[in-house]
């Protein structure tokens, strides 16, 4: 059996038609969004037409039952980051590859244990692998998810500082970016970390042509001064 075809079919079975992750036990520890959190995420400015234009797509795809803002920041993901197999040079070669590999990442949400999730995914991949193939799963690094209460004293002070500096009521949201050390701060140092985002949607974080709006930068300075 062609390894590239086998791997493609295997990975295709990891996501259901409704956009959910097809790994037994994957969602067992996921904490449901509260009504308060859903109201806050609903306040995040959103236009489906503008979002599709920004992404360069004609149609959005995601987990059914959740809005795009909820999917992006509050639901776990299973993503293929890269696929490698067969001839990659110029022109074509009528070969059958001897191997195929994929790089996979999963963004987790509060209460999910990364070591447990890695075990579940590895076990499921091996269980689904066809008998004609030999599969090896190499586990990479992992970090625990982190969330902080938006109603504590420091949170209230931060929100008031943002409102003073920017002249608008702050919008609370969850973010899928990974900063593993903030969970260590909470677990080891017993302190909360508040991530006060100043970037705009088109600032291209960690991407080519990354930028930062000067007005947002300046108002961020005032926000920090107000807070501390």
Features from the language model and the residues they span:
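Generic solvent-exposed, charged/amphipathic alpha-helical segments
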Residues: 8, 12, 122-126, 159
């Amino acid at each position: 059996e062609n390894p590239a075809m086998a791997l493609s079919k295997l990975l295709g079975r990891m996501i259901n038609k409704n956009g959910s992750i097809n790994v037994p036990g994957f969602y067992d520890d996921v904490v449901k969004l509260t009504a308060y959190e859903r109201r806050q995420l609903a306040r995040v400015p959103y236009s489906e037409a503008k979002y599709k234009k920004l992404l360069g797509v004609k149609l959005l795809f995601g987990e059914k039952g959740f809005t795009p803002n909820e999917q992006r920041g509050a639901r776990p993901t299973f993503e293929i980051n890269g696929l490698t197999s067969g001839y990659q040079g110029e022109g074509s070669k009528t070969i059958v590859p001897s191997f195929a590999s994929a790089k996979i990442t999963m963004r987790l949400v509060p209460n999910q244990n990364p070591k447990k999730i890695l075990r579940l995914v590895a076990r499921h991949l091996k269980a689904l692998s066809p008998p004609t193939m030999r599969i090896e799963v190499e586990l990479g690094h992992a970090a625990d998810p982190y969330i902080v209460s938006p109603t504590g004293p420091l949170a209230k002070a931060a929100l008031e500082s943002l409102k003073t500096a920017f002249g608008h009521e702050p919008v609370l949201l969850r973010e899928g970016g990974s900063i593993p050390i903030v969970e260590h701060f909470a677990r080891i140092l017993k302190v909360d970390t508040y991530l006060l985002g100043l970037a705009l949607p088109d600032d291209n974080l960690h991407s080519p042509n990354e930028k930062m709006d000067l007005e947002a930068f300046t108002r961020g300075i005032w926000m920090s001064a107000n807070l501390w």
